[in-house]
């Protein structure tokens, strides 16, 4: 009688570590909810062209494992490993969880381009302006309005009507309004406060003529710039609001202002928006996940390649089998 052999236990398949094609190659992860977004696709193309291995990971598909001495990120049932550097592309709608994921990566000792603290500071318009002002960076006069009793004094302090009204959270020109009268301001503020929003009032810089300058900073360099002009009947110059962009060659003053703003906020990649005032450039916003389709189109520059090259420079040296 033949002896029965016990069925062998199936061993879980091991994920093979992807071989790096050269000593200079790096394993790059881009945190992005949508792999088809222009900026995400361009980063993937630029990494491939330079011989790096790039993986796109959905931020919201990451699980956070908190354990003393062994922090981990879980993705599709497995711990994320063998990462040399991460480029976070965190959308405004998922800022809270996105910051937690980036902070977890920092706790794992993985270089990130940008860090959680830098992203958090730049996402809050008031906090960002506070940091910039503390570092001597020129910004528009700004007051936070808490209730209607503060409004008249706030308007006086920022230079009078018209005045810019902004939500402290918001991107792509969303939540930015202009008010020409007390009636307009009162109506806007009451509506926003009823919705639980926090509001800042900001001086209107007439000489900017419904245009601004976007300078992209990578590392410690201003690598590209464009002037954005609002479409007719609109004062917001954001490309997402229908503004038009054209290549701009910034002066040394503008470059130093943009690089200084990024450095003050701790951003290694930043879209710095500046208004041209009579007293010189003033920073109105810093974007920690700047889109660059408009900038590449206006300038012909390989912005994605510059970002990937900087990511590779700050990456940790990979372990090799």
Which residue stretches match the model-derived regions?
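Polybasic, lysine-enriched low-complexity intrinsically disordered terminal tails
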Residues: 1-23
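Redox-cofactor binding/interface segments in oxidoreductases and associated redox assembly factors
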Residues: 87-88, 202
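Active-site nucleotide/adenylate-binding loops and adjacent lid/helix of ATP-dependent enzymes
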Residues: 2, 22-48, 54, 65, ...
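Phosphate-binding site of ATP-dependent enzymes
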Residues: 23, 176-265
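Short glycine-rich anion-binding loops that position phosphate/pyrophosphate groups of nucleotides
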Residues: 91-93, 168-170, 289
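C-terminal active-site "lid" helix and adjoining low-complexity regulatory extension at the edge
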Residues: 3-4, 263, 276-321
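Glycine-rich, highly charged phosphate/nucleotide-binding loops
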Residues: 60-82, 92-98
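Protein kinase-like catalytic core scaffold
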Residues: 163, 223-224, 270, 282-284
């Amino acid at each position: 009688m033949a002896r029965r052999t016990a069925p062998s236990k199936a061993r879980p398949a091991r994920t093979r570590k992807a071989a790096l094609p050269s000593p200079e190659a790096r394993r790059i992860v881009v945190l992005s909810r949508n792999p088809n977004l222009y900026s995400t696709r361009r980063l993937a193309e630029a990494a491939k062209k330079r011989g790096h291995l790039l993986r796109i990971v959905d931020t919201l598909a990451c699980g956070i494992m908190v354990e003393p001495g062994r922090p981990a990120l879980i993705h599709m049932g497995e711990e994320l490993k063998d990462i040399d550097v991460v480029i976070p592309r965190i959308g405004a709608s998922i800022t809270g969880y996105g910051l937690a994921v980036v902070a977890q990566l920092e706790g794992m000792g993985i270089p990130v381009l940008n860090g959680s603290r830098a992203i958090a500071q730049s996402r809050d318009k008031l906090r960002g302006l506070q940091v910039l002002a503390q570092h001597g960076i020129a910004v528009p006069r700004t007051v936070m309005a808490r209730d209607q009793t503060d409004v008249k004094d706030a308007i006086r302090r920022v230079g009078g009507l018209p005045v810019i009204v902004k939500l402290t959270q918001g991107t792509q020109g969303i939540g930015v309004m202009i008010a020409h009268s007390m009636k307009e301001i009162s109506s806007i503020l009451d509506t926003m406060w009823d919705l639980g929003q926090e509001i800042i009032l900001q001086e209107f810089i007439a000489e900017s003529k419904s245009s601004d300058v976007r300078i992209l900073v990578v590392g410690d360099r201003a690598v590209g710039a464009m002037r954005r002009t609002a479409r007719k009947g609109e004062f917001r110059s954001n490309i997402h609001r229908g503004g038009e962009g054209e290549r701009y060659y910034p002066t040394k003053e503008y470059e130093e202002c943009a690089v200084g703003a990024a450095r003050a906020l701790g951003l290694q990649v930043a879209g710095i928006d500046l208004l041209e005032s009579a007293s010189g450039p003033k920073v109105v916003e810093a974007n920690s996940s700047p889109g660059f389709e408009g900038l590449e189109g206006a300038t012909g520059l390989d912005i994605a390649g510059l970002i990937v090259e900087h990511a590779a420079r700050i990456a940790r040296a990979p372990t090799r089998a």
